[in-house]
Design a protein with these regions (language model features):
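Ubiquitin system architectures
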Residues: 1-88
Length: 88
């Protein structure tokens, strides 16, 4: 049986000053994390979805968490950005 690698993550809510902390499987994509956080009731489902920001870098929704885990970090601080961005 293969053990699933996990990384502790602390998500900050886009509007409220609240946090959600959990050990996340490193093969989970940010889209899957978004769906999970909606299921947990931490964020609300909304048109346009959310962006996840780690160390001032916007994470790709299709990318797994493992693409962004720095070596030796105990807990990743991930901001959730919920504002609609319009490109002109």
């Amino acid at each position: 049986m293969t053990e699933v690698m996990k990384q502790k993550c602390r998500f900050s809510h886009p509007l409220r000053r609240t946090f959600f902390e959990e050990d996340v499987p490193v093969d989970m994509t940010f889209k899957e994390m978004q769906d999970h956080l909606i299921e947990e009731g931490f964020i609300e489902e909304k048109k346009g979805g959310y962006q996840f920001i780690f160390e001032d870098h916007m994470c790709k929704l299709a990318a797994p968490l493992s693409d962004y885990v720095p070596e030796g970090v105990e807990c990743m601080e991930i901001r959730i950005h919920g504002l609609l961005i319009v490109l002109t």
